[in-house]
Amino acid sequence: LLQLLGSQNDMATIRLGKDRQYRKSISSLFPESRRPSGLRKTRVSYNSLAHRTTWLRSDLEDVQQGDALIVFTKRAVLDIAGRLEASGRKASVVYGSLPPEIRRRQIKLFTEGKTKVVVSTDAIGMGLNLPVRRIVFMQTDKFDGKSRRPLNVSEVKQIAGRAGRYGMYDTGYVNAMGGEALDYIRAQFENTEPKISRVSLGFPHVLLDMAEPLNTILKIWKSVEPEPPFEKISIDEILFLYERAYKAREDIDGFEDKHTLYRMLTCSIDIKNRDIVWLWLYYCQTYTADICLDFPTLEMCTDAGLMKYETYYKMLDLYHQFSNRIGKNMDVERLELEREKTEDRIMRYLVRDKKNYIQKCKYCGRTLPLGYEFRVCDQCFAASRNRKGRSR
């Protein structure tokens, strides 16, 4: 939180919840700044953050109350939660695409003891206050949008730091599934975090005043290599949306207005969700038709089950975001009502039996091993190869 006070004699205050590397960076930007004594608080000392000497078994039998199991995909979260509940252990779930209110409700179930375990992606390290006794890394690598890579020191420490809670679990524990994974997590946790050597650089809005078309400006900006320590924030999603808008440019009023177009292109949406991209483009084409945008409906979602309601919630967010960016009136009362109804539906899906989310072979229906990367079991894959061999 950056609190800027109006008077020149007042001092600006920055409250940081990050590690020492971030505080050093802020101090270097504001050399006259100081940290008031007595304000820094720690929930649990890293010295008391202990590692288990034995790793978690793949059958999940030694999962304990107060555990947080960490994976890095929504699919894996629901799979593990389903396996736990199949053995009689209720689990809360947390992942990035869940609406904030649903995360809070899931965490409330955990804090009140109605669920014994929480299964989460790395979203658990983002400001959630949990009574977690033990963090268990079920995976030690993640897909970062470009490639699959091992967790780095900062990521391990950010997640591991959720273990322990002052006055309840004074000692936090960190574990992993498998000896090799535990050795890796221990090594990363004991490593020193690298110094912050890069500063993120966003797209300069002043470039929108140039005479060139927006796509030319964006491509030129993407090709520029800034000098260290600056590193450009990716504009790949903006370019993706520009391509979609360009194909429909004849139906978009004010397409040549770079400032308006840029506000539309920078809507924060899930570009991997075809329904969300469709609705975004529809708003681009129809935003001048009335004082309000068309309100999204559940029938616009082509998914089914839980995914359908998660997509609809994203549509409601897009309606709110696009309206604000373009200056359209909103049906606020209806928006709040639809959000509440959708949150309730999502919560019902997550509270009900999760065994349907356990990953099974798409041919024979056998339960796949925990962490299995494929949709077909070894037996069916081998049988398929044998049939192909005989047909030759």
Regions found by a protein language model. Name each.
Residues 1-44:
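Post-DEXD/H (motif II) to motif III coupling segment of the RecA-like Helicase ATP-binding lobe
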Residues 36, 42-43, 88-100:
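Conserved RecA-like helicase motor-core motifs
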Residues 8-11, 31, 39-40, 64-66, ...:
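Short glycine-/polar-rich loops that comprise or flank the Walker A/P-loop
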Residues 11-13, 62-87, 91-94, 231:
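Conserved strand-helix element at the start of the C-terminal RecA-like helicase core
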Residues 204-392:
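Non-catalytic terminal extensions of ATP-dependent helicases
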Residues 134, 141-144, 149-190:
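Conserved segment of the helicase C-terminal RecA-like domain
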Residues 73-75, 93-105, 121-125:
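Conserved helicase motor
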Residues 110-129:
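Conserved two-lobed SF2 helicase motor
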